[in-house]
Design a protein with these regions (language model features):
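Membrane-interface interhelical linkers
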Residues: 1-72, 78-87, 136-162, 166, ...
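Membrane-embedded alpha-helical core segments of multi-pass
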Residues: 13, 17, 73-80, 100-107, ...
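Alpha-helical transmembrane segments and their helix-entry boundary regions
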Residues: 33-37, 67, 90-95, 102, ...
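Residue-level recognition of transmembrane alpha-helices
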Residues: 37-41, 97, 120, 124, ...
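Alpha-helical transmembrane segments of compact multi-pass small-molecule transporters, enriched
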Residues: 42-47, 96-110, 209, 243-247, ...
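Hydrophobic transmembrane alpha-helices of multi-pass small-molecule transport proteins
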Residues: 43, 48, 105-109, 119-139, ...
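C-terminal transmembrane-helix exit sites in multi-pass transporters
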Residues: 81, 102-122, 132, 250, ...
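Alpha-helical transmembrane segments and their membrane-interface junctions
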Residues: 169-177, 248-265
């Protein structure tokens, strides 16, 4: 039953990561979202080096370039997410971001001519209803965010999780061509046993280089960096994110049919943690539509594994 432990651990770790991302994304700190990227890149880079030193995956550095399209889609999507977290409640942003799986399914139907099961169609429709409901309440209601940020910035902030979902979905879609079959993958020198490690290491090293570039950019702009202890929330978020990636692989390798919906419950974990630790409180109407989104995501996770 180790897969069950890893499944629950993944949901908790990623839920905790979302909590600390939100705590580290300070609205009054102009470059806080970029500083989070630097922290995540540093931790992922360290994990990539650890993988290369402890595992014989036959890594070819050219795979950094080969896997670059996927890596960039994932990295840029996360940067948009971190920006949105500065102004948007985690209770709203996380369920919307997790609709990326539904978008990826639609891309497969449209571009690869794949078919959806009736349950998948129902799940996607439920997600759409929930997202439209949240969007309607956010843009037509008299929210505190509009009063605090102004209408323009409030709308921009609300768009961030949607941009994340789109970019992450395209990243997952393109990832199919890299990871679906090791015999036809563009990745160089991989086997059935090493293909996922090679892809993940390429992603983590790219994130580390991206983080280094952002660090140099901010130094050139004379952005002030507080002592490391003051960045503890950003660092903890990066650690939980990377740890969740580790447990995720082992969870799906055991019993993917049950593991997938458990992992998808990260939305619920994030919602609970935000309510408990961040004291986020939304209207009952908004919570209702968020619940609809979460139900749709869980149904989609189940339908994809049946």
């Amino acid at each position: 039953m180790s897969w069950l432990f890893f499944s629950v651990a993944t949901a908790i770790l990623w839920g905790a990561a979302e909590l600390f991302y939100k705590k580290g994304a300070l609205p009054n700190e102009k470059y806080s979202h970029l500083k989070i990227c630097v922290c995540v890149g540093a931790v992922m880079g360290a994990h990539a080096i650890f993988t290369l030193l402890t595992k014989d995956i036959g890594y070819n550095p050219i795979n950094l370039l080969v896997y670059l399209p996927v890596s960039l889609l994932y990295i840029v999507s996360m940067a948009f997410s971190y920006f949105g977290m500065r102004f948007l409640e985690e209770s709203i942003s996380d369920p919307i971001e997790n609709t990326s799986g539904a978008i990826c399914s639609l891309l497969c139907v449209i571009l690869l001519k794949e078919t959806l099961t009736p349950l998948s169609v129902v799940a996607i429709l439920i997600i759409v209803v929930g997202v439209v409901g949240v969007g309607y309440l956010e843009n037509n209601g008299d929210t505190q965010r509009k009063k605090t940020l102004g209408k323009k910035l409030a709308i921009i902030a609300f768009c961030m999780p949607f941009i994340y979902a789109l970019l992450d979905a395209f990243g997952s879609f393109v990832d199919i061509f890299y990871l679906d079959d090791f015999a036809s993958t563009p990745l160089i020198g991989v086997t059935e046993d090493t293909i996922e490690d090679v892809a993940n290491t390429s992603y983590e090293l790219t994130f580390a280089l991206f983080a280094l570039g952002l660090f140099i950019f901010m130094k050139a702009k004379k952005v002030k960096f507080a002592p490391i202890p003051q960045h503890k929330d950003k660092i903890l978020a990066a650690i939980f994110e990377t740890a969740g990636q580790f447990t995720y692989v082992y969870a799906l390798s055991g019993n993917g049919v049950i593991a997938a919906p458990i992992i998808s419950s990260v939305c619920v974990v994030s919602l609970l943690l935000s309510r408990i630790f961040l004291k986020e409180k939304l209207s009952w109407k908004t919570y209702t539509f968020i619940a609809v989104v979460i139900i749709g995501i869980l149904l989609l996770a189940v339908s994809e594994e049946l």
